[in-house]
Amino acid sequence: MTVVSVEHALAGKLPEGGEVTVRGWVRTLRGSAGLAFINVTDGSCFAPIQVVANDTLPNFDEIKRLTSGCSLIAKGVLVKSQGKGQSFEIQASGVEIVGWVEDPLTYPIQPKPMTPEFLREVAHLRPRTNLFGAVTRIRNCLAQAVHRFFHQNGFNWISTPIITTSDAEGAGQMFRVSTLDMVNLPRDATGNVDFSRDFFGKETFLTVSGQLNVEAYCLALSKVYTFGPTFRAENSHTTRHLAEFWMIEPEIAFADLAEDARLAEQFLKYVFRAVLDERGDDLAFLAERVDKNAISKLEAFINAPFEQIDYTDAVKLLQHAGKTFDFPVEWGLDLQTEHERWLTEEHIGRPVVVTNYPEHIKAFYMRLNDDGKTVAAMDVLAPGIGEIIGGSQREERLDVLDARMAQFGLDKEHYSWYRDFRRYGSVPHAGFGLGFERLVVYVCGLSNIRDAIPYPRAPGSAEF
């Protein structure tokens, strides 16, 4: 018995007339004059394969009762399909029914249109739909491409901790990790919670970023990256925010902001090319049902050189745009999505790297420029979504870093280990961060980031 994936069976690389076995789930079934036509999917590709069963099979009556979602093992001869819509089909010599759907009428995944809002309520079943099958395969393709890009460019992958004592962003929006009894919290002499009696002997949190930790390895191995889960206790109910998401964070030694921007451009174009080359079937479905520009926008992104513009110049352009924005535009305020999209879509018409932001709106670790007012920071803006990458050259001068930490109200002793990097062989270095789910949203044309991750975690939502 030669078990093959549906993708392999449809690819035209197996000998026609050979016997094969596929294992999967029923997508649809229709009958006609002693025949049953079963569309079977195993998730390996977008298209199902048609299994043709005739009434000579001993369990044909059982086969006719199959419904969407039932699991089976079908064996038979692989032949060119005479019908439209598929290249090959299987003339079944046997169909073993492995699992029935208990009640087809109440099975949540029906062969009919279903809203993303409904499917979020059954997130454990939604990968069985065409949409989320496609999104999941594209997510996997992107993840594989991320690792491949960095490996091919000499980066080492670093596993940074999920439990930490440091706030990498200085914003304080962190989830606390504790085994203390929440009903009877231990107190010290001053009445504060005594975290010395907690599991780790101190306050600990879920990480908001692996950047500070990965910098340590950058200053020893030169080119490194981390790719893992991060957590933000940000009480935001927008379509752009998650409480748990994955971050890609490369870091390069002996590098400035210009080199950081080049790396970001090379990286994005590489992973987009991988999706175009490897997941054309899924992109075609998304272009038909979700975002008509799913393919063309990636091709345009790859072929367009990035435009680079200083934040100060971007503000001037926006102020003279002849357009009324919902959010104010003035020097010293962060750019909002509507501003970013105007720059990329209406004014410049391609991806834009905005650099040198005001120092007070960016993180403490970003390198202070000579003007004393801006930092060597960048945001990569993409048409259709706005910011997709945020990065900077890091502050390598200990005295300047200490002053920045004081400005942000951070205890430098708490970050003594991070300051050590500036005390022992400090070098200029740079990096960026990219929320992986935002990348998935952009590629797939999704309208809500909660559809870009298998089990979304957001305020008031932690199901499954």
Curated annotation (Swiss-Prot):
GO biological process: asparaginyl-tRNA aminoacylation
Catalytic activity reported: tRNA(Asn) + L-asparagine + ATP = L-asparaginyl-tRNA(Asn) + AMP + diphosphate + H(+)
Enzyme class, spelled out: ligase
Name of protein: Asparagine--tRNA ligase
Pfam families named among the record's database cross-references: tRNA-synt_2, tRNA_anti-codon
Subunit record text: Homodimer.
EC number(s) on file: 6.1.1.22
UniProt source species: Xanthomonas oryzae pv. oryzae (strain KACC10331 / KXO85)
Gene (UniProt): asnS
GO cellular component: cytoplasm
Cell compartments where the protein resides: Cytoplasm
PROSITE patterns: AA_TRNA_LIGASE_II
Keyword match Iron: no
Any one GO molecular-function label of the UniProt entry: ATP binding
Entry similarity comment: Belongs to the class-II aminoacyl-tRNA synthetase family.
